[in-house]
From Swiss-Prot:
GO BP terms, alphabetized: pantothenate biosynthetic process
EC number: 6.3.2.1
Protein known as: Pantothenate synthetase
Origin species: Escherichia coli O81 (strain ED1a)
Binding site for beta-alanine: Q61
GO molecular function terms noted in the UniProt entry: ATP binding; pantoate-beta-alanine ligase activity
Keyword vocabulary terms for this entry: ATP-binding, Cytoplasm, Ligase, Nucleotide-binding, Pantothenate biosynthesis
Length: 283
């Protein structure tokens, strides 16, 4: 497994792979890898000849400096996991390598609408940072496919739109959420939970599933469903942050023409902001 830290060396390897006619898959990550990331890697390996995993804690997508400062950097452990998975290439650049003149004056990519709604409304600049780094990685790696987790549902929708709008010839693969046995969606942020909070955390998925059951039973008073869910989260020990029920295909409000709904939930548990989602077919 090659570990590359600079743009010239990455370009050199990508040119070689292209000359050899290899099909390349990219898995963009911020490191602190868990089994959910490994599921992305496995999906990429099944679809391509060569798998490139990027590990970069992107300062442009953090709206709170304290979150950036405390985000776990576990490069050695991450590389050991990826080597066991037989990943071909790890791209682990420094911030200086990606943003040589800093982030303030760096050209950015913004996806109107999707960047500022829902999760974007509570995290200003976050999705602009995501679309900027992902587009830069697409230009550098030139992958045939790229794999993203469905846990970040809005992010996946944003990347699909960016790819369509910018004309990237890349297949975007959404990989289903991987959960612990108790239902908690795997996330790097779960590491912020204390042992006691970890016992409470599966309650998020239980509330999510309760909303889904109500929708499948034909309930359509969304304001009441959301209000009850927020109360249930608070009673379980969370601080409810945002609960949305949206059209899964547009992320707009549910209409009589909506065929699928996506339930998007964000809640604080101690210092960890947990997010989760669930798709529901509407009768």
């Amino acid at each position: 497994m090659l570990i590359i830290e600079t743009l010239p060396l990455l370009r050199q390897q990508i040119r070689r792979l292209r000359m050899e006619g290899k099909r390349v898959a990219l898995v963009p990550t911020m490191g602190n890898l868990h089994d959910g990331h490994m599921k992305l890697v496995d999906e990429a390996k099944a679809r391509a000849d060569v798998v490139v995993v990027s590990i970069f804690v992107n300062p442009m997508q953090f709206d709170r400096p304290e979150d950036l400062a405390r985000y776990p950097r576990t490069l050695q452990e991450d590389c050991e996991k990826l080597n066991k998975r037989k990943v071909d290439l790890v791209f682990a650049p420094s911030v200086k390598e990606i943003y040589p003149n800093g982030t303030e004056t760096h050209t950015y990519v913004d996806v109107p609408g999707l960047s500022t709604m829902l999760e974007g409304a509570s995290r200003p600049g976050h999705f602009r940072g995501v679309s900027t780094i992902v587009s830069k990685l697409f230009n550098l790696v030139q992958p045939d496919i790229a794999c993203f987790g469905e846990k970040d549902f809005q992010q996946l929708a944003l990347i699909r739109k960016m790819v369509a709008d910018m004309g990237f010839d890349i297949e975007i693969v959404g990989v289903p959420i991987m959960r612990a046995k108790d239902g908690l969606a795997l996330s790097s942020r779960n590491g912020y939970l204390t042992a006691e909070q970890r016992k409470i955390a599966p309650g998020l998925y239980k509330v999510l599933s309760s909303i889904a059951d109500k929708l499948q039973a034909g309930e359509r008073d969304l304001d009441e469903i959301i209000a009850i869910a927020g109360q249930e989260l608070n009673e379980k020990g969370f601080r409810s942050d945002d609960i949305q029920i949206r059209d899964a295909d547009t992320l707009l409000e549910i209409s009589e023409n909506s065929k699928r709904a996506v339930i998007l939930v964000a809640a604080w548990l101690g210092d960890a902001r947990l997010i989760d989602n669930k798709l529901v077919e509407l009768a």
